Regions:
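Conserved beta-loop-beta element that borders a ligand/cofactor-binding pocket
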Residues: 1-18
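Non-catalytic, surface-exposed connector residues within folded enzymatic/regulatory domains
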Residues: 6-9, 23, 84
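Short beta-loop-alpha junction of Rossmann-like oxidoreductase domains
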Residues: 18-24
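C-terminal substrate-binding subdomain of Rossmann-fold SDR/epimerase-dehydratase oxidoreductases
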Residues: 27, 33-152
Length: 152
């Protein structure tokens, strides 16, 4: 390690959960649906890798304790699913009857269509494995969002 300092580098992909910023796709969609509004979305064909925030914190902790100095680790769930599936799971956790505006927004010219972390090295070096299924994490995130709505 240069200068006697160990370091690891985290490449954090898409993390969601309580305390997320209001302008992320997940947070904005939750807020629209909780308000009974139809969110305007792309068709949702992008394949995406979402990781619950508590799992991301666990990955970072494990990197600090067990990571190889100088290593670069991708932090994600390691699994990509169509964005449409995440959005439908989110909606279903709020109210199955709410409409989704899938396809109302066109893809941008720079739209990323596939994002997935390769967590092979992270798992091998640190023992990290995501523990929270998206459906469970999104329910916790929605519960938190409801408390924010009541306090604002």
């Amino acid at each position: 390690a240069a200068l006697g300092m160990d370091h690891v580098w985290a490449r954090i992909l898409s993390v969601y959960g309580p305390h997320d910023g209001p302008n992320t796709m997940i947070s904005a969609t939750i807020q629209k649906l909780l308000a009974g509004q139809c969110p305007d979305l792309t068709a949702g064909e992008q394949k995406w890798d979402y990781l619950y925030s508590a799992d991301a914190a666990d990955a970072l902790y494990r990197m600090a304790c067990h990571g190889r100095s100088g290593a670069v680790y991708a932090v994600g769930s390691g699994t990509a699913r169509p964005l449409r599936e995440y959005i439908e799971t989110l909606r279903d956790a709020i109210d199955l009857s709410l409409p989704l505006g899938l396809g109302k927004i066109p893809y941008g010219p720079q739209q990323v269509m596939f994002l997935q972390a390769d967590i092979t090295q992270l798992a091998a070096d640190t023992g990290f494995a995501p523990r929270t299924a998206f459906a469970d994490g999104i329910r916790a995130t929605i519960a938190w969002a409801k408390t924010q709505k009541q306090t604002n």
